[in-house]
């Protein structure tokens, strides 16, 4: 009997170092060759990812086994799977959504499909995802959703006792880096919401699926390996994660819970405690300067979430937006020098000098400044002075 057709969609951005291994693991699946296709959606990579794919897989691209979408703008995670629908084969039954830094075991697709085919209600199916660098340790198998305060509690995170996850089970959410999605979802509740751009797009779609009385299944027989070496060892040191996950959690609440209910109160209480704890962990394991920078991205994500800002946001915006935390005459001279530098070099400069910030603690003005300005600490001030206004940001 002919197997259901699976479209395997890989969202790609600056992963030249591993994208070939990821694609090769797809092409090597123990699944009928005429029953799956590969769609790679590249989000305007600048590290040569697209050129590498074209060089290594030119034959597969020519014969349409691989469809390569070379986007000129970054559409984000959610946007990648929306773009894929424009070129997907008409008879697809399942989409395997996967990150570009995931490598599949040879039986992964077959095992995911086997579990999905057991019931029409099995709209999401995931498997065991291990770390690529440490194949004895689980990355995660999924999560329990806590929708009223926008938190997903991971299951199997960093677990080495695999026997606990040797049986198939029903979960709220599956590991989003490798999950099979039934076409029934698109017809029944719609697709990914591009408003999120990064993070919470999976949670949103799975939550809507649960509300539609569908079932999400984990099968231990489907195995993948996630390369996380480009990520921070501490996610609270990742400004992109801090901004988009904070903003996404608020967008999730505003979208799925229309009134300002108990859910919002629980979110403000529990979620902020979680982020505050993480940021202070960074403070004690990093330095004061980095702590302030990352705190800024958390507050900006929080503010933009409340404001309802959606889609892509350039967290490295053009122009020089500076807060100088310092005191005394030296900081005043430095600010004057920076203003002169901006005029000579035709640079848009937004400058705030907060006097005595390090002596008196962070003022209300300093906290407000996190929303709109980059930060220079004492070490950076010295660098600027030593290089005669070469700017670090």
Predicted features and spans:
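Glycine-rich nucleotide/cofactor/substrate-binding loop typically near the N-terminus or early
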Residues: 351-393
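Conserved donor NDP-sugar-binding/catalytic core segment of glycosyltransferases
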Residues: 107-140, 144-147
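Short beta-strand-to-loop acidic/aromatic patch adjacent to the donor-nucleotide binding site
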Residues: 92-103
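Non-catalytic, C-terminal membrane-associated alpha-helical segments of glycosyltransferases
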Residues: 240-244, 259-317
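Glycine-rich, basic loop-to-helix element that forms the pyrophosphate-binding segment
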Residues: 70-88
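Short, acidic, metal-binding catalytic loop of nucleotide-sugar glycosyltransferases
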Residues: 25-35
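A conserved acidic beta->alpha catalytic loop
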Residues: 25, 42-51, 73
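A short, conserved alpha-helix in the catalytic core of glycosyltransferases
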Residues: 172-181, 185-191, 195-223
């Amino acid at each position: 009997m002919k197997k259901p057709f699976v479209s395997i969609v890989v969202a790609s951005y600056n992963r030249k170092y591993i994208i070939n291994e990821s694609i090769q693991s797809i092409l090597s699946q123990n699944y009928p060759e005429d029953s799956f296709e590969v769609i790679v959606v590249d989000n305007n990579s600048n590290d040569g990812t697209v050129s590498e794919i074209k060089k290594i897989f030119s034959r597969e691209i020519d014969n349409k086994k691989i469809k390569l979408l070379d986007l000129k703008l970054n559409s984000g995670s959610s946007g990648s799977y929306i773009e894929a629908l424009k070129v997907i084969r008409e008879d697809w039954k399942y989409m395997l959504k996967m990150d570009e830094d995931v490598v599949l075991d040879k039986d992964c697709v077959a095992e995911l499909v086997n579990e999905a085919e057991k019931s029409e209600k099995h709209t999401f199916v995931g498997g065991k995802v291990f770390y690529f660098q440490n194949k004895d340790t689980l990355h995660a198998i999924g999560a329990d959703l806590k929708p009223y305060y926008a938190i997903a509690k991971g299951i199997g995170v960093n677990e080495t006792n695999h026997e606990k996850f040797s049986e198939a089970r029903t979960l709220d959410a599956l590991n989003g880096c490798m999950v099979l999605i039934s076409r029934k979802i698109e017809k029944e509740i719609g697709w990914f919401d591009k408003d999120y751009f990064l993070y919470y797009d999976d949670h949103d779609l799975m939550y809507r699926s649960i509300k539609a009385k569908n079932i999400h299944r984990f099968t231990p027989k489907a195995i993948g390996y996630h390369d996380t070496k480009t990520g921070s060892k501490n996610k609270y040191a990742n400004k992109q994660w801090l901004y988009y996950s904070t903003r996404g959690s608020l967008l999730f609440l505003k979208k799925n819970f229309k009134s300002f209910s108990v859910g919002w109160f629980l979110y403000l209480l529990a979620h902020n405690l979680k982020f505050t704890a993480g940021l202070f962990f960074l403070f004690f394991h990093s330095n004061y300067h980095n702590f302030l920078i990352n705190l800024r991205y958390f507050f900006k994500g929080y503010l933009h979430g409340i404001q309802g800002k959606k889609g892509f946001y350039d967290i490295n915006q053009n122009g020089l937006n500076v807060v100088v935390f310092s005191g005394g005459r030296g900081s005043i001279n430095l600010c004057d020098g920076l203003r002169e530098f901006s005029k000579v070099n035709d640079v848009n400069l937004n400058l705030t000098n907060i006097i005595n910030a390090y002596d008196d603690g962070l003022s209300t003005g300093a906290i407000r400044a996190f929303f709109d300005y980059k930060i220079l600490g004492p070490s950076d001030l010295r660098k600027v002075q030593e290089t005669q206004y070469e700017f670090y940001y």
